[in-house]
Regions:
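Alpha-helical tetratricopeptide repeat
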Residues: 1-128
Length: 128
């Protein structure tokens, strides 16, 4: 039986996205994460990994310098997983690259408070 977006289990789409992301094929990864997101929106977002679909798609957007597209995904991922410091750190990078230094510094400080050491480097370098 062929898989279509309406009957494909979400996890394979997510893991295929991860494979593409690890191969630096960000456009294909974005497409797979987008399908996983579409499926989750249709069938419920209570599955524990849904935040990661948004986080990973946002990370891919960040890698291809489509930072303005990454910010809403990082923000939604934080809605689903509000104590994830890595999401704050990466959204901070996206904010900084889009000229929103105040928001970037706020996110980096939050990430630092959640144990992300690299965020402290950003705070020291860019938030004086």
């Amino acid at each position: 039986r062929a898989f279509t977006p309406s009957n494909t289990p979400v996890s394979p789409l997510y893991y295929l996205g991860n494979i593409y992301q690890n191969e630096n094929n960000f456009q294909k990864a974005i497409a797979e994460y987008s399908l996983a997101i579409k499926y989750a929106q249709k069938n419920g977002e209570d599955f524990g990994l849904v935040y990661a679909y948004y986080q990973n798609r946002a990370s891919c957007y960040l890698k291809i310098n489509e930072c303005s597209k990454s910010i809403p995904d990082f923000t939604y991922a934080l809605k689903l997983n509000p104590d994830n410091g890595a999401i704050y750190a990466n959204r901070g990078i996206a904010y900084y690259k889009t000229g929103k230094k105040t928001e970037a510094c706020k996110d980096w400080r939050k990430a630092q408070s959640l144990g992300i050491q690299s965020a402290g480097t950003y705070v020291r370098r860019y938030c004086r």
